[in-house]
From Swiss-Prot:
Family statement: Belongs to the profilin family.
Location(s), subcellular: Cytoplasm, Cytoskeleton
Subunit structure: Occurs in many kinds of cells as a complex with monomeric actin in a 1:1 ratio.
UniProt name for this protein: Profilin
Organism: Litchi chinensis
Keyword Acyltransferase included in the entry's annotation: no
GO cellular component: cell cortex; cytoskeleton
Molecular function in Gene Ontology: actin monomer binding
Amino acid sequence: MSWQTYVDDHLMCETDGQHLTAAAIIGHDGSVWAQSANFPQFKPAEIAAIMKDFDEPGSLAPTGLHLGGTKYMVIQGEPGAVIRGKKGPGGITVKKTTQALIIGIYDEPMTPGQCNMVVERLGDYLVDQGL
């Protein structure tokens, strides 16, 4: 299965009638493995800051999580495993796997819990596969 299939079929799929606004699978080095058509153009420094927060939990809290020029307020996640961010009625979930970052961006009417479930379910599966 291609990485694009994971994005299309597992991240951008419909959940309770809702779906993510955008999603991607990105290597720890910032290389894009696969992404939805409308995933924001991000800067390498934004991915580096996300990776730093996984190594040093809490480092993003003072500045916020930035992706594609959008700033998200960092909310409670799972140190070293999941970073969650909020911006207005939407937000972002980033799950770290052995080799990649699974990123889901949502907006209302999708809920934070639905986004977390979609992103973390795929992330947990990939971790189990050694990826």
